Amino acid sequence: IDKITRNQCQLCRFKKCIAVGMAMDLVLDDSKRVAKRKLIEENRERRRKEEMIKTMQQRPEPNSEEWELIR
């Protein structure tokens, strides 16, 4: 199994993993896989929002001349 061929046949890959001793209790069922994916996406979104807030807080307030240019 290499980076190029690993997704060609997922069943073959799974069988090879089992054959070399992969623990079956580490295999996620569909509901656990979906829940894990959802948690990952929620964490990404939370980090994105935190980074946006951090960026906005670090921005200096425009001075009076800059406000005039904006208006």
Curated annotation (Swiss-Prot):
<dbReference type="GO" id="GO:0004879">
    <property type="term" value="F:nuclear receptor activity"/>
</dbReference>
<dbReference type="GO" id="GO:0008270">
    <property type="term" value="F:zinc ion binding"/>
</dbReference>
<feature type="region of interest" description="Disordered">
    <location>
        <begin position="48"/>
        <end position="71"/>
    </location>
</feature>
<keyword id="KW-0238">DNA-binding</keyword>
<dbReference type="GO" id="GO:0000978">
    <property type="term" value="F:RNA polymerase II cis-regulatory region sequence-specific DNA binding"/>
</dbReference>
<dbReference type="InterPro" id="IPR050234">
    <property type="entry name" value="Nuclear_hormone_rcpt_NR1"/>
</dbReference>
<keyword id="KW-0675">Receptor</keyword>
<keyword id="KW-0863">Zinc-finger</keyword>
<dbReference type="InterPro" id="IPR013088">
    <property type="entry name" value="Znf_NHR/GATA"/>
</dbReference>
<keyword id="KW-0804">Transcription</keyword>
<comment type="similarity">
    <text>Belongs to the nuclear hormone receptor family. NR1 subfamily.</text>
</comment>
<dbReference type="Pfam" id="PF00105">
    <property type="entry name" value="zf-C4"/>
</dbReference>
<keyword id="KW-0805">Transcription regulation</keyword>
<keyword id="KW-0862">Zinc</keyword>
<keyword id="KW-0479">Metal-binding</keyword>
<dbReference type="GO" id="GO:0090575">
    <property type="term" value="C:RNA polymerase II transcription regulator complex"/>
</dbReference>
<dbReference type="GO" id="GO:0030154">
    <property type="term" value="P:cell differentiation"/>
</dbReference>
<comment type="function">
    <text>Nuclear hormone receptor that can act as a repressor or activator of transcription. High affinity receptor for thyroid hormones, including triiodothyronine and thyroxine.</text>
</comment>
<dbReference type="GO" id="GO:0002154">
    <property type="term" value="P:thyroid hormone receptor signaling pathway"/>
</dbReference>
<feature type="zinc finger region" description="NR C4-type">
    <location>
        <begin position="1"/>
        <end position="17"/>
    </location>
</feature>
<feature type="DNA-binding region" description="Nuclear receptor">
    <location>
        <begin position="1"/>
        <end position="22"/>
    </location>
</feature>
<protein>
    <recommendedName>
        <fullName>Thyroid hormone receptor alpha</fullName>
    </recommendedName>
</protein>
<dbReference type="GO" id="GO:0045944">
    <property type="term" value="P:positive regulation of transcription by RNA polymerase II"/>
</dbReference>
<dbReference type="InterPro" id="IPR001628">
    <property type="entry name" value="Znf_hrmn_rcpt"/>
</dbReference>
<keyword id="KW-0539">Nucleus</keyword>
<dbReference type="InterPro" id="IPR001728">
    <property type="entry name" value="ThyrH_rcpt"/>
</dbReference>
<dbReference type="GO" id="GO:0000122">
    <property type="term" value="P:negative regulation of transcription by RNA polymerase II"/>
</dbReference>
<dbReference type="GO" id="GO:0070324">
    <property type="term" value="F:thyroid hormone binding"/>
</dbReference>
<dbReference type="GO" id="GO:0048384">
    <property type="term" value="P:retinoic acid receptor signaling pathway"/>
</dbReference>
